[in-house]
Design a protein with these regions (language model features):
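Membrane-interface alpha-helices at helix entry/exit sites of multi-pass transporters
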Residues: 39-51, 151, 295-298, 455-467
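Transmembrane helix-loop junctions at the membrane interface of multipass transporters and ion channels
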Residues: 127-146, 205-221, 282-285, 290-310, ...
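Short, non-helical or kinked segments that cap or interrupt transmembrane helices
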Residues: 24-32, 36, 40, 104-119, ...
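Helix-loop-helix hairpins and the membrane-proximal interhelical loops
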Residues: 1-11, 66-85, 210-253, 343, ...
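Transmembrane alpha-helical segments of multi-pass membrane transport proteins and ion-pumping complexes
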Residues: 17-24, 28, 54-67, 90, ...
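Early transmembrane hairpin of solute transport permeases
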Residues: 34-141
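Core mid-bundle transmembrane helix pairs that form the ion/substrate translocation pathway
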Residues: 152-248, 257-261, 316-332, 347-354, ...
Length: 580
């Protein structure tokens, strides 16, 4: 049996690498869509910033693995052989499920998937244990940490609603202040806006990212908690003064600083806190094997109470995992497809091919929203409506230019609101999914920005409903698939484990090595979302430097400026006047 468990551990190690690949392919949308959608920098520059954030987060990660070890079930009630089957079922189900979502281009929560897979597999193991012992099946609740699952479900509901409303409200207020012709407002209050934005991003970086890092001492964390208000005010004041100097003296585009800093912080926090969920299960299996070897007991008699002890992943292992994540960012086509879904649903472009079709719930929501808009328009005075509509009047499209999905203002709002919500939930120890927050903030900001017009609203809402339904399907399918795999291994033994293991690897290889054109290369439309440098150069060639704001240096470096963004982020006027 020892050789069997060694083979199982080797398989779990291979699956861990694959899980990193498919997991990062889905989670990359959390920290890449804002920078890529507004083309604040080239695709390569954005990836380099995200890659550095991922490696830094992996290096400083504490690597705490409580979720995989004891966060979902009570390990002291299971034997070594039972938990090895649970860990095997979880990893097989996880890679298959995440790869399916990646193939569909739908973002989902990797945290929710791993938690409910652990729950489903542990539930199946507990049932087999109770049946063999002749105990009542109602005792299965003693084996599962049910409060964790309720916390995750409540986190899903809360994060979806709060993130959408927050993104919509903040973006609406920001657009009222800046408008689409934001160059004048940028010179007046850009420094204050930048101070608020970067303060929120740094606060998020500390609360969500660095606070759990291995180098953070307990006394440092206590000092930060005791002096949070003073730290935030000092940061805001200092950054505002710095940005005012950069804007007035050096003519620096601070939107680039804000958006790239937000991209780095989200990538850092992702690697620092979420990395271990991809490798936590194989490492928990490895720790279980070492304890079993040291005990000398039979595999079906040794109870795994040792998993209740806190454990951290080795830094070298986390850093190696970080390199795998970076390679995924650069080379995964499915990551690009998931990012494309998020950008398409929040894009200001209209009249183009929509990714999702219309649905009956989408039509009902649109009709209800239009009716509510008519009621509001009758309440608000017409002069106020005209004043608000003038603030939301988009720039006309210049012939020959390709409109961006969204501009710098909306991209920065997406990052700021996401950072504030995630950091606040982390400080309050509330369950929250970063995927749900970042996606719904982007949807709320696009709704408030008028990106969903009469032509595209029903398609965009149908797409959002598809993604949200996929989130709830994640929990059900994850627990069910892991339970089925566990049941098959309990019944079929070693032969079933070997067949399922090789079957999972075959499906993944077949899915990721397709030769069809739409799976190997990006379409022309999606490629235009990413290639900022070539777009900037082509814009400069079409217009004179004086008109386009492109100097010879900018033509060579494709370095975006605020003036250039005003000409490059244009979209068609709406078919109807804007009402609040």
């Amino acid at each position: 049996m020892e050789q069997y468990y060694l083979v199982l551990l080797a398989f779990l190690g291979v699956i861990a690498v694959i899980d990193l690949f498919v997991g990062v392919s889905n989670d990359a949308v959390n920290f890449l869509n804002s920078a890529l959608g507004c083309r604040i920098s080239s695709f390569r520059t954005t990836l380099w910033v995200a890659s550095i954030g991922v490696l830094a987060g992996a290096t400083f990660s504490s690597g705490m693995m409580e979720i995989a070890r004891s966060g979902v079930f009570h390990p002291q009630l299971f034997t070594f052989s039972e938990l090895m089957i649970v860990f095997f079922a979880v990893m097989v189900a996880d890679v298959i499920l995440l790869d399916a979502f990646n193939s569909l281009g739908l973002p989902t929560s990797t945290t929710v998937s791993i938690v409910f897979e652990l729950m489903g597999a542990a539930f199946a193991a507990a049932l087999f244990k109770l049946i063999d012992a002749g105990a009542p099946l109602s005792d299965v609740a003693d084996y599962i940490n049910s409060s964790k699952s309720l916390g995750i479900v409540s986190g899903i509901l809360i994060s979806v609603v709060v993130a959408f409303i927050s993104g919509a409200v903040v973006q609406y207020l920001a657009r009222l202040v800046f408008t689409f012709k934001f160059e004048k407002a940028y010179r007046r209050i850009g420094a204050i806006y930048g101070g608020i934005a970067l303060t929120a991003i740094i606060y998020f970086l500390v609360m969500k990212g660095a606070k759990g890092a291995s180098f953070m001492r307990p006394e440092w964390i206590q000092w930060i908690n005791a002096n949070t208000a003073v730290i935030l005010f000092s940061l805001f004041t200092g950054l505002t003064v710095l940005f005012q100097v950069l804007i007035t003296v050096f003519r620096v585009n601070i939107f680039k600083i804000i958006i790239l800093a937000g991209t780095f912080s989200l990538a850092f926090a992702f690697a620092g806190n979420d990395l271990v969920k991809f490798v936590g299960v194989p490492l928990a299996a490895w720790d279980s094997w070492k304890e079993w070897q040291a005990s000398g007991a039979a595999d079906n008699a040794f109870m795994m109470g040792g998993l209740l002890k806190p454990s951290t992943a080795p830094t070298a292992f986390l850093l190696l995992s970080g390199f795998v994540m970076v390679l995924t960012l650069w080379f995964s086509k499915k990551a690009h497809r998931v990012i494309q879904t998020s950008i398409n649903l929040s894009s200001s472009r209209s009249g183009t091919q929509e990714q999702f079709g219309a649905s009956a719930p989408g039509r009902m929501i649109v009709r209800g929203a239009m009716g509510l808009g008519k009621v509001i328009s009758q309440i608000i005075p017409m002069p106020m409506q005209r004043g608000i509509a003038s603030r939301f009047e988009p720039l006309p499209v210049v012939k020959g230019e390709i409109p961006l999905p969204f501009d710098y203002v909306r991209a920065s709002i997406n990052l700021i609101v996401s950072a504030i919500l995630i950091a606040s939930a982390t400080s309050l120890k509330l369950p929250l999914s970063t995927t749900y927050v970042t996606f719904m903030v982007a949807m709320g900001s696009s709704f408030a920005d008028g990106a969903w017009d009469r032509e595209s609203a029903v398609y965009r809402i149908s797409g959002v409903l598809t993604v949200i339904s996929g989130w709830f399907l994640t929990a059900l399918s994850a627990s069910s698939l892991a339970a089925v795999v566990a049941v098959l291994v309990f019944w079929g033994g070693e032969a079933a484990a070997i067949i399922l293991g090789f079957g999972a690897i075959f499906l993944l290889v077949r899915s990721n090595l397709k030769t069809r054109e739409d799976d190997v290369t990006l379409s022309d439309e999606s490629r235009s979302v990413y290639d900022a440098a070539s777009f900037s150069r082509s814009t400069c060639r079409r217009a004179s430097p004086k008109r386009s704001g492109c100097s010879r240096a900018s033509m060579r470096t494709s370095r975006p400026t605020v003036s250039a963004s005003l000409r490059r982020s244009r979209r068609a006027p709406p078919t109807s006047s804007r009402t609040p």
